[in-house]
Amino acid sequence: MRILHTSDWHFGRSLHGQDLGDARALFGRWLIDTVKTQNIQLVLISGDVYDRAIPPVGQINEVMNLLEELSSITHVLLTSGNHDSAARLGMYSHFLRGNIQVCTRVEDIGTAREYLGTGDDPGVLVYPIPYLEPDLVRSVLSPNDQPLERSHQAVMDAAMRRIGDDLKRRRSEGDLRPAVVMAHAFIVGAAPSDSERNIEVGGVPSVSAETFENFGGDPQAPTPGLSYVALGHLHRPQVIPSSQVPIRYSGSPIAYSFSEAPGDKSAVIIDTHPEDEKLMPHAQRVEISGISMPLALSTVDIPSAHPLVVLTGSMDSLLGKAAQVDRESYVSLTVTDDARPQSMVSRLRAAYPHALSIIHAPAHTPLLAAPQCDLATMDIRSTLADFFSQQGGQPVSAEENSVIDQVVSKVKEDLQ
């Protein structure tokens, strides 16, 4: 069976105020085309299809239309993330085709979704875990009357023990199909970017990778165990290192922060019954103990409507580089001149039509001693002039002093 793993669509999110509708449309077309050309039989979406719990109507329609089109050509399994509203997302399952399953209920953790292969392909077992907010689920997942510890580790351990119990039963009955877990969490060893919302609770924001290997510390973990863990939450595509089980973040399909520059995006393709002649050229075979047929993992690049470019330098150097940058790129510029250049923003926007962030950060900022002053006798005009002089790296001009006088006079007038 050939599976595509994606996550963190965040439909409705912008980048420095820039609407990303064209990027969303490009991703949607790419996803449909990839499912068709790569013969994808199951799409896993590991949380955060929306950026907000109550998304705008336009983004609801975009996601629903894309899911409807996907469901006409393949199976889709979707879980909720920390940005989604699990309750609202769960309601959509009543309006979608039978090929789509939306998994948001904590009570359903440990129930495998079974997908059958064709021919001698046995198919796959998928265990979806929606985003687990410790305060909301530590009583539900507790095996007794006492709530679990208030941490992501504790609730994920409990979820994995439920999955382990079901998988042990299946293994004892001779079911050796590959087993995949979907989760939305921050795993130890992963590298975050600036665009993820902090999910720290009780000082323990992360989950150990060993949780997926030993099923939450179960001394009698099922054998064979998991074949793959399809993660969501972090926006950079990455592999969790030193794990016995393949654990991957697909990353978001669209870049939502300049910390993700250059913004290269991808999805993961999992072949649970790989045939050499059908594998992608760079596919990686993964041997899973107890499963006769190795998995094959590969990535497929997602096109970008607007590559991200981050540039730092003097005003002259930045203006000189403009011709080398694709005019469709979204650009972050940091100007390092000691003095703020005249008309800095307007000149840079003329050179870079999609400059979304322009910052003046002098390369040589003098260290200033803490001022000693008498607040009662301090002159507001001279204080403001001193401040702007220090920040701009040069004395204020007569024109700027005139603006300061006007502002101070207006404020005093309004306060009378």
Language model region names:
Residues D8, G28, D48, V63, ...:
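Divalent metal-coordination and catalytic microenvironments
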Residues L4, L125-Y127, S266-V268, V309, ...:
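Conserved beta-strand elements of the Class I
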Residues T37, T272-Q416:
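Accessory, non-catalytic peripheral segments of nucleic-acid enzymes
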Residues L70-L78, R327-Y330:
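Short, surface-exposed connector motifs at secondary-structure boundaries
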